[in-house]
Amino acid sequence: MPGFTVIQFTQDQMRSLTGVSAETVRHWRKTVPYLATKTGKAARFSFAELLGLAVTHELVNCLGVHIGTVSIGVDALFRLLEDSAAPVLEGGIAIITPTAASVRDSGSWSIEPSASPTLAIPLNPLISRLQQHVLPVAPSPSQASLPFPPEAVRSKA
């Protein structure tokens, strides 16, 4: 799409926004093939990749899942997020298995029998947290703006 520039985040920005340490990213690069391409000081991350890192951080830190157990599923998640549009992700739930990943709409998601253990991470809280850091909400003005421009009024005296 001409004229459309994707914002790229540096490694320092990525660590600050996602809360993932440099050592952790280094370890994840060894186990997740998608992250293996993001090496060196020139590595840049898109918003979708930040979201993937935030989901992975939730899996590892909140759910206690070993990254090696779900590395193929996490790799699939990064590739899926890379190809997904932002409106699809909002309100979505990331479904990760040891070998696959998908994003489902939270309104239509239901528990389906699966052949393998499945982890579900809601994306909205993560997207909101990332957006809050990237685009802080400006304070609302104390006076509401007028829906029409002011006009000078003259009296006939």
Where are the predicted features?
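Polyanion-binding surface elements
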Residues: 1-28
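A short, Lys/Arg-enriched interface patch at domain edges and termini
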Residues: 50-81
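Short acidic alpha-helix initiation/capping motifs at coil-to-helix transition points
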Residues: 3-6, 47-52
